[in-house]
Amino acid sequence: MPDSQSPNGSLFSRGMMAVIVAQFLSAFGDNALLFATLALLKQQFYPEWSQPVLQMVFVCAYILLAPFVGQVADSFSKGRVMMVANGLKLLGAVVIVFGGNPFVGYTLVGVGAAAYSPAKYGILGEITTGDRLVKANGLMESSTIAAILIGSMAGGMLADWHVGAALGVCALAYAGAVGANLLIPKLGAARPGQSWRFGPMTRSFFTACRTLWHNDETRFSLVGTSMFWGAGVTLRFLLVLWVPVALGITDNATPTYLNAMVAVGIVAGAGAAAKLVTLERVSRCMPAGILIGIAVIFFSLQQAALPAYLLLLLIGFFGGFFVVPLNALLQERGKRSVGAGNAIAVQNLGENTAMLLMLGLYSLAVKLSLPVVGIGVGFGAIFALAIAGLWLWRRKQ
């Protein structure tokens, strides 16, 4: 790796660009691999119920490893942690490519993703500071969403042509991410010398949880980002049922296109937040959170494709504007109190727990045969009220 660099360097320094490129390739691989592996399961006649298990093992890896991955990120150079994590993803993809059990391979990818996340966000606070950190987060989120959009489409399209080729492209993407990690400046460990025994590590993690929860700013950020990502994954599944009911379209492509509009909107919103919101004025993002819920209500009531596409673009814009400043706030304040890696690990625990809870409630609503339009309206209203409540809570602190 190159020598260490000052955290006050340019936003477009070689180190920052290496982080962004590595993140794009890694996220591209994650999303392309999901759809390529789903195609493999169909090709090998796995039962349909097995498909969501892929996402479950991915999320569960984040939750189970949450007490440990933050310390790993803070105990070593974060660039090296990212490289090893992408190496685990590469290994998982290779297992699937060469005919191994796809669930074992995808579990390895999930473990790599869980280890990668605290390092990728924590390193931003080490190679840039202050308001540049908000802009760096904007670049990171834009890169991630672009990779999600392109990777998902590429995975599905390539799998339709040749499943093996699709899986091979995923492995190449991870290999490229490992290569990009080599260009990240070698930084010192943020918090070296911590105990590696199970008891102290778990106590350290839950101490970090308590520390962040008892701080007004980090608690505010944790709750806000967890609500956002929990709602985001729920909206993705809501679209699958909403499209045939509201638009009368029964193909598989339309929900994907609608999801793409959300992704494009998030990229634009993240860019706007980087320019308009600072850490000192982070509450400026809160109206956007409320508007997400209101826009979901209007979207759920649509019966034509064009306004649906436009509203989802708007929902994505509000989402990007809302979540980027909250991420930056947590990284900046968390770095000072518990270390950036531990802060992001705690954030991952909150976000993935919120995903499981919200999806569970959504599944219950579907099982109770509630109308999907009603579910969408209720979901949007509850989200808007929850963000409004969070904003009021923040103002009272």
UniProtKB/Swiss-Prot annotation:
It is a multi-pass membrane protein. CDD domains: MFS_MefA_like. Gene3D superfamilies: MFS general substrate transporter like domains. The chain crosses the membrane at residues 16-36, 53-73, 91-111, 139-159, 164-184, 229-249, 257-277, 282-302, 304-324, 344-364, 372-392. Keywords: Cell inner membrane, Cell membrane, Lipid transport, Membrane, Transmembrane, Transmembrane helix, Transport. The keyword Iron-sulfur does not apply. Catalyzes the facilitated diffusion of 2-acyl-glycero-3-phosphoethanolamine (2-acyl-GPE) into the cell. Its main location: membrane. GO terms for cellular component: plasma membrane. It is found in: Cell inner membrane. Belongs to the major facilitator superfamily. LplT (TC 2.A.1.42) family. InterPro entries: LysoPLipid__transptr_LplT (IPR023727), MFS (IPR011701), MFS_trans_sf (IPR036259). This is Lysophospholipid transporter LplT. Pfam families: MFS_1. One of its GO terms (molecular function) is lysophospholipid:sodium symporter activity.
